[in-house]
Amino acid sequence: MRDTAFRSIKAKAQAKRRSLWIAAGAVPTAIALTMSLAPMASAQSSNLSSDAVIGSIAQGVTDGLTDYLKPRVEELPAGEVTYPEIAGLPDGVRVISAEWATSKHVILTIQSAAMPERPIKVQLLLPRDWYSSPNREFPEIWALDGLRAIEEQSGWTIETNIEQYYADKNAIVVLPVGGESSFYSDWEGPNNGKNYQWETFLTQELAPILDKGFRSNTDRAITGISMGGTAAVNIATHHPDMFKFVGSFSGYLDTTSAGMPIAISAALADAGGYDANAMWGPVGSERWQENDPKSNVDKLKGKTIYVSSGNGADDFGKEGSVAIGPANAAGVGLEVISRMTSQTFVDRASQAGVEVVASFRPSGVHSWEYWQFEMTQAFPHIANALGMSTEDRGVECAPVGAIADAVADGAMGTCLTNEYDVTGGKAQDFANGRAYWSANTGAFGLVGRINARYSELGGPASWLGYPTSSELKTPDGRGRFVTFEHGSIYWTATTGPWEIPGDMLAAWGTQDYEKGSLGYPTGAAVEYNGGLRQQFEGGYVFRTSNNQSYWVRGEISKKYAEDGIFAQLGFPTGNEKLINGGAFQEFEKGNIYWSASTGAHVILHGDIFDAWGAKGWEQGEYGFPTSDQTAITAGGQTIDFQNGTIRQVNGRIEESR
């Protein structure tokens, strides 16, 4: 089973010679060749050398056996997208967008100068006090993915509870997305459709983004699993001034000893069809030495180094085990390689006088549940290295008063903070959201995407004010909404969360809210020619420049949205009116008329409009317009109707039927 004991170099000096290179005898021939048996089954019978063990295991992982390590393909939840403008970044680097999956989980899409071929995603889990301490800076904890990293999101957020674990801690958790088989390294050249330059991106491009745009205090820890563990140590040795802590969970910390180049080459070929020569050049070259953790361990002196590994023994079903199922055969062999190479690294560190917190477990295989466990075991050492206070490592908290009553059903989860002051009232953070209280509104808890949008707008300090309800289900069952002092936020899975000002909400309500022809909002209310415009699934709601609110829907709204039409018509002066055979809507400078046979068309106030009106409007001789009113080259205006044309030429009305 996994134990929780940690041994420093000094503590295990006497046992140093129990190198896992010698202990390779604990790996049976059957494992080395077929990776099908538990490693302790014939511990006394195998006399394989370490390079033979590694080479044989490598041979076994070349046929897709590491597919089990590929995280489930899960898209991140769609969120509100913002477009941060961060000054002072390196040339060619910018944050294209920031998508808020929750109020504490943001997905950055970054244009990289080092890897310009495609945008790069990075997930950030924001600190506990991100909102309650808006002027504070926080340390960073990087968590690198494994060999089978996918492009949708980090394996850490798919396969572990990292988001929940760090929710009550005051650190920015940094999760690069993608990088399959990259070792997060700068590659020698393009390969397999990729031109990996991950180390440059992470250290020269991402770090300034966090510093200048996300309130980093530049104190950093870097960790990783498997391939990411190797990368974490390599990046830290190449940039020792950037990191105070480096952690490897089942990493390969010896890349050049006999058998390891073969193993790495086999792994890259298996996980995506990559050529290791494109990564660090020919085996034995200077680049391989530069990316050999054991050879550069002296550069980490003075830093906190955490190294962990199992030994390949399947402990599923045993007391204290964190395993969620029987071991995968490849997971056994890969963990054996990790154990042997990690031991070599620790031994080399001892020779160099570099202290390592080594946590070698008496069991465990190459799998996510073990790495989740190591994440929790490493955190106290991370916190010490980053100088985090006791309060920043977690909280002892409890809801009180009205907020306690509002969250009594447990839906908000455990508290992450105590109650704190916000503009005009109080707030308290919980695992699933945030609760708000003011004397005028009482206390309500908000969760999910609506809470994230409210937080992004500024929470109680925004124009919405305080919530006056918790999250409610819409009558049509499709969405959710929360009411506030000065408006509401409505959400559906397809439209996202959007806030509606109170007066525009009232106008929308005349169409039966989301059940009516306008449907749900699809964007925020935006400034529009001295007023506001908000788009809905079936039209728009406008606030005019004199603070009147009206809706425009259907074909009339489509016509009104065409280029140049607003300049012709101005704001609506009323809502759509149904008439015999169709509908029309009045605007400041004219009307739009619609019928099923003619479509929607514009007619302007003036002599043509008056002449048409004298003949009974759309119910009279001419019928509905069949074209928009337009200018003519001779100087004047013209418009066609179902039964004729009316023109104004040089101030004179001409009618033809």
Swiss-Prot record:
Domain of life the protein comes from: Bacteria
Compartments it resides in: Secreted
GO MF term list: acyltransferase activity, transferring groups other than amino-acyl groups
Residue stretches spanning the membrane: none
Functional note: One of the two major secreted proteins.
Native source organism of the sequence: Corynebacterium glutamicum (strain ATCC 13032 / DSM 20300 / JCM 1318 / BCRC 11384 / CCUG 27702 / LMG 3730 / NBRC 12168 / NCIMB 10025 / NRRL B-2784 / 534)
Cellular compartments per GO CC: extracellular region
Keyword field: Secreted, Signal
Signal peptide per UniProt: 1-43
Keyword flag Secreted: yes
Cited Pfam families: Esterase, LGFP
Protein name: Protein PS1
Predominant location category: secreted
